[in-house]
Amino acid sequence: MEKDPSVADPLQPLCLSDSSNHVTYASSLLTLEELKILEGVLHQNKDVFAWTHSDMPKIHPPVGSHRLNVIPSSRPIRQKVRRFHPDRQKIIQSEVDKLLTSGFIRKEEYLNWMVNVVVVPKNGEKWRVCVDYTNLNDVFPKDSFSLPRIDEIVDSTVRHEILSFIDAFFGYHQIPMFQPDEEKTAFETLHGLYYYKVMPFGFKNVGATYQRLMTKIFKHIIG
């Protein structure tokens, strides 16, 4: 069971299956009737919760995918290979193994496009492995799809007693890459070349792609 999330209300755990890992939390301030209703809704829809990567159904490509829309006159980007300390190499390979196991990336022998990974500090002694798409972002036109205005969202909550939020499990990785653009996401490590089959973090327009898909999916309940 994960540590209780940090929120204002005191919390009580709700188990959605026989597994001790399938736990969410509800406010301890709910009445018994409210808690019973909430439990019923959660159990009725427990199939929409993802606890591991294998629980993620992913978006069907015809519904949405991430296109890079590279400027036609652009030449393939190939960054100079970076070298890392052996300790960092182990961290990188561990992350690559996780991505391979999850089906997010695929190994390839040769690709025209290639960038490097970077290892940055995260929460003290931990490290985060990222792909450096800085150069690639220069050859993509900006996607100007409008993001929601925070002030309008706040105004729309007036006089509503209950608010609903969605926390998508590895949300970007649930969106597939447009297949002809997959090789342009390639990155190199000590053990080879890999490319993303799903939308990675770090690209300039991923936020717009994600918001466009959310607007499409929830169109019937927005507004």
Where are these regions (language model features)?
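Retroelement reverse transcriptase polymerase core
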Residues: 6, 13-223
